[in-house]
Structures are given as structure tokens and as C-alpha cells.
Amino acid sequence: MKSSRYNYFAADDGKIICLNGVTGNVFAISEDVFPLLKDILKNPNDQIYDANLYQSLYNLHFLIDDDLDEIDCLRKRYQDSIKGSLYKLIVNPTQECNFRCWYCYENHVKGQMNNNILERVKLFIDKIIARTDINSFELSWFGGEPLLYFKEIIYPLARHAQCKAEKEGKSFWQTMTTNGYYLTPDIITFCKETRLTSVQITLDGNRELHNRTRNEQGKPSFDRILENIINFCRSNIENEVILRINYTKEVIEAGLKEVFESIPDEVRPQIRVNFQRVWQTVGIEKTSEALMEHLKYIKELGYPLVNNTAFDIYRGKQCYADMLNYANINYDGNVFRC
């Protein structure tokens, strides 16, 4: 046996946190016992300690077989993660948006996907779904605000893709990133009919702070968006909302308890909460402890978290843009990886 090259150790309040970077296995031991652990990992073949210790470390991947090439294993894991029978296509119907959030990186170019490009996207979808190596097709909507052109772009393209997938016997579903303002009852019905079961919607803090940042020419949007989120969840038990909270120090200090307490209990399991710091404040403001308190409380209320408070590591691809079977088509016909 030999020691894994991906064993890491960190001191923490009289304990040593031990992590294996390949498996994500982690445990803590006292500082007094750490020299013994280091000796075992340095000389694993001496077998001078209890055999159960060696077996436990082997099971946790801290000790590995002599002929195991960990780098080769990681390469294979990555290759397996970017391949597959799923094709993910993101379409941006427009770069326009009805909001003007101060931190937004988009350029809000006016214009929508024209009919010529729309028909070419349909042909592309037909070609992808017909491939024998593709079993599943995910159509995802982004922008700008995609629902600005629901009737012109989303409705015909989604119906076309769904029909083609059903004809070919392939799995089909949709996802969307939207500000949620135009997620009306009619569109929610459409979502149910076309398997659009997951949406990401953002709140920028409590009602006051959100309306200060996310408004339609001064008109508040908080109550309308929150109502749309609840209606979307209630329309289909399979529906999921990734509720992104763009936060700054001001958002955290102002508190969010009232926001999460106001959402009915029965839909909370369908709402996955994802806190993301506004990128212009990264490294400037410190909110770690207060953020952890929010996460713990929100979890107690029955919401699943995207920001899991448990430790985890990436295994395989870092992002869907790493996938081989993926593309992003912009409203003007340009195709991007990211």
C-alpha cells in the first residue's frame, strides 16, 4: 500500500481535519493522535499498529493500492462526466430586460431572435434529437429576460422540440432563468404542458431592498415575483424553483426571515435556496457568520439549500459548459460555449 497523494490536513481548535481530495472523505482527530496517523501514512507497509486502522484508512482512500494511478483515475472521471447521452441547449431569445439591476453584467442590446434564426434553431434541434447517441434533450432559456418574447420565441420553439422528442422517443424537459415578473398563470400552464419544471428566480433581499434594485421603471416587483414563485410550485408537485438570493452586507444585515417565513409550508420543499454574493462586493465585505446563521434558519424552515452547509467537493466537470453535448445559441444566431 501507499499513501494517497491527495491527503490534506488542517488544524482547527485542537483537532486535525483530515480530507482526501479524491473521494471527499473527511474526518477529525485530536492533535495528540495526529503523529500516529502521519507515521501510518508514511510507512503503510510496516503494519506495526492495529490492522483495523490500516483497513479504515484504506476504505477512506487515505491508503491506496501500490499500482493505483490516481491522476489517471481523475482524468477518466472527468472524461466520463463530460460525455453522456444528454444534450443541453441554452437559447437566449433576447438580451433585453425589463429590469436594470445595478450589478448586471449584460449589455441589454435591443432585439429578438428573428424568424430566419428561429427556423434554423428548429433544424438544429431536429438534427440533435435524431442522433442515435442522444437519449435526452434539455432546452434551457436564458437572456436578458426570456419571457419578454414568450409568444414569439419560447412557445413555438418549445412546442417544436417537444414534438420532435416525442416522435423520436427521446426524453425532453425544459429549464429557465427568469426574473419571474412575467411568470403568469397562462405561462405556468404552458410550463406544465411542456415539462418546464425548473426555473431560477432571483430576489435581492427583503421587500424594500429588492424593490430598490429590481423594479420595472420604478414599479415594485417583489410581491408579484413571490406570488408567481408560489403559483409555479403549486401548479405541479414536480416543479422546482432555484431561489437565488443576490446578497451584499446590507442584504444580510437587513434580514430575510420575513421573506422565507411568508412562503407557505407546503411549497418550501420545492424551493432550493442559493445565496450568491454580488460580484462587485467580493473581497470587500465580510458576512460569513451572519450568512451561516441565515442558512441554518432557512434550512430549519424546510427549504433545501444549494449552498449545502455540509462539506463537499467537485467530482468531474465543474459546469455544464464543460459538457461535449452542449451549446448556447444567442438571439442573433451566434453560438457560444459560455
Model-identified regions with their sequence ranges:
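Local cysteine-cluster metal-coordination motifs and their immediate loop/turn environment
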Residues: 96-106, 337
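Conserved glycine-rich "GG(E/T)P / GGGxP" loop and the immediately following alpha-helix
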Residues: 90, 94, 107-277
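Flexible glycine/acidic-rich beta-alpha junction loops that bind and position SAM and/or redox cofactors
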Residues: 208-212, 270-290, 308-318
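N-terminal [4Fe-4S]-dependent radical SAM core
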Residues: 3-28, 51-90
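Alpha-helix C-terminal capping/helix-coil junction sites
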Residues: 58-59, 233, 299
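Accessory C-terminal segments flanking Radical SAM cores
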Residues: 3-35, 306-338
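Glycine-rich, aromatic-lined ligand/substrate-binding cores of catalytic
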Residues: 292-308, 332
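Short acidic, hydrophobic short linear motifs in intrinsically disordered regions
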Residues: 32-49
